[in-house]
Amino acid sequence: MAPKAKVPAENPERILRRTHYSNELSPEMEGQQVVILGWVQRIRKLSKISFLIVRDREGLTQCTLPHAKTAPELLSILDSLDNEYAIAVQGQVKQEKQARRGVELIPDKIVVVNTAPATLPLDTSGKVEADIATRFDNRVIDLRRLEAQLTFKIQHFTVTQMRQYLEAAGFREIHTPKIVATATEGGADLFRVQYFEKKAFLAQSPQFYKQLCLVGGFDRVYEVAPVYRAEKHNTPRHLNEYTSFDYEMAWIQDEEDVMQLEEQMLHEVFTAVKQKFAEELEQLKAEIHVPKLPIRRIEVREAIELLKAEGLNLPPDSDIPSEGEELLYQLVKKETGEEFFFLTRYPTAIRPFYTMPLETDPTLTRGFDLVYRGMEVTTGSQRIHRYELLVEKLKETGLKPKTFAFYLEPFKYGAPPHGGLAIGMERLTMQMLGYANIREAVLFPRDRTRLVP
């Protein structure tokens, strides 16, 4: 007769399994037994009743313990709790009009999964504000704040919707190298790394590899990945590592195909975000305006004249500085009520060598930026697809074709006309939710001074 199998001892931290997140509880579940998992947000004790507020990633749940009807051992556990304890609560759902979502939980079991010190580096409830340096020194605890949870919940949904839109439009997701042998844009704003016996760089952009995938026959590609810029900025709008949402598409007529796809995608995505997160946006005091199509196009030379009329004088064929983008936004907003506009026809001298020049005026390009609420969030263009012109433009910038042979050579073999763009996801999130600092839109910022956490 075979010996009986030993029954493993119960692990107290595994007794209760989550049945619902906080936002899944509703008055229609009256009397239903559920389990929630999360952290103690706060405890409020009155003479005859106590309230335990539990926070999970989806929000808050009020747990109500009437002293006369609650087991003494449960009240004893309640007395042992403190803010940020990790706990599991089992209980019955009860309708309560004054509670969040019209529902509360009457616990019959509380399990302490882990404790936290009485003195915390931050107040996760947000009642006591901390400066941004303290918050990011303690970023993991800072991420427990409801505002941070909502920010990255909305950002996740936004990226997912953008991915789905491109997938439906026939794009394939790709994953390009982040350790590269040459600079994508030229220049010195590169992070150098030692790659065994060779010198290498962290990728500024997936640009070359996006294009090479199209030359390789992929037709339509996109990538969501980090890029690295060794720019010595220390501003509320710059990061040295950020997430770039890139796409590249072949067989285009011109840059308008790229711009039209982006504006249609953003219109659909913003509509979905606004519909899904009405309550969350209200909590964040954020208002999303869905862009009307088509988004206005303003040629750079026209923009310079508009700015001149407003007292901001720029040299002819110069780039538009950040204060110019903000001023143009105010003009567009006042005139049309819209928050997006494209800047087009950028001068050749200030765009990358692979940007297609305008046939009727080679001093201008088929490059563009998208400005949202006064900040550039996208840069893109039609690219040069003819080998001879690509080499010519590269030489004009002082770069050596031999250094870029791996990129240039495939263009000898029938490269299709193509174009694409890159969207800075942190900037898009920042502007969408109305933050003053881009660091609010990235989990663990990498800027001029910060390497940890």
Predicted feature locations:
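A generic secondary-structure signal for well-formed alpha-helical elements
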Residues: 44, 89, 95-97, 114, ...
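Hydrophobic alpha-helical scaffolding
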Residues: 29, 148, 152, 177, ...
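Short Lys/Arg-rich cationic patches that frequently serve as NLS/NoLS or arginine-rich RNA/DNA-binding motifs
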Residues: 1-6
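Secondary-structure capping and boundary motifs in well-ordered enzyme cores
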Residues: 79, 183, 198-204, 213-216, ...
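Class II aminoacyl-tRNA synthetase-like tRNA-binding/catalytic domains
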Residues: 11-250
